[in-house]
């Protein structure tokens, strides 16, 4: 099966009747879902792609295939736990059945404790510290996923990205039309930061430690006063901040509310030549 148009038609039709699917479903539907997940796993297709105009196009049918796999796959024993223990899940490890030759061909590092679920793509020269990459995600070349970082379902991580320790990149499977969380090329995401709900961090941006960005987070450019929602502009340097709250009924000052603050914007050359710590100093 090589025709993506035909594959998409089968997935779309099956999803319209997904309530009828179960672990006993065989034939064309199961074969198509498994084939689609294998293509995602190899990086031959991806849930979202950046267009020439900078906008991201979401392939909803691929998310549908991922969702249907939960109905089709039975729970089963997954080996590899500590002290010869097991897990109990529907989605196998990406590395299930891999041998030394498979890892050499894939050409990325996977440190003990790294968990990657089948259908997530890991590109060449990626480093996976003890971390978690969920199904349908895409991690591009020469990116570092540091210790205890999490890449959510269908998230798109660009080239030369550094996700620091404890970073959380949210997954977005539903609603189907929603964009996944996206970290574009050459971004640095500081320790314990969270980017969720389909937000986009544009190319070359730096998020300091402990920055939290969701769809309702106000992202304020300190120099211009401009407010962004759901997207950090390219080559922005962002730190945690707060906004004055509304007065309380008794007239006293209300509690401040969290926001993210763009403290500066840099061009590509400055970003390449300047250390992260220097960029975050003010």
Swiss-Prot record:
Substrate binds at residues 109, 146. It is found in: Cytoplasm. GO terms for cellular component: cytoplasm. Its EC number is 2.3.1.117. Its main location: cytoplasm. It holds the Pfam family THDPS_N_2. One of its GO terms (biological process) is diaminopimelate biosynthetic process. It catalyses: (S)-2,3,4,5-tetrahydrodipicolinate + succinyl-CoA + H2O = (S)-2-succinylamino-6-oxoheptanedioate + CoA. Keywords: Acyltransferase, Amino-acid biosynthesis, Cytoplasm, Diaminopimelate biosynthesis, Lysine biosynthesis, Repeat, Transferase. Pathway: Amino-acid biosynthesis; L-lysine biosynthesis via DAP pathway; LL-2,6-diaminopimelate from (S)-tetrahydrodipicolinate (succinylase route): step 1/3. It is an enzyme of class 2 (transferase). The keyword GTP-binding does not apply. One of its GO terms (molecular function) is 2,3,4,5-tetrahydropyridine-2,6-dicarboxylate N-succinyltransferase activity. Homotrimer. HAMAP family: DapD. Belongs to the transferase hexapeptide repeat family. This is 2,3,4,5-tetrahydropyridine-2,6-dicarboxylate N-succinyltransferase. The gene is dapD.
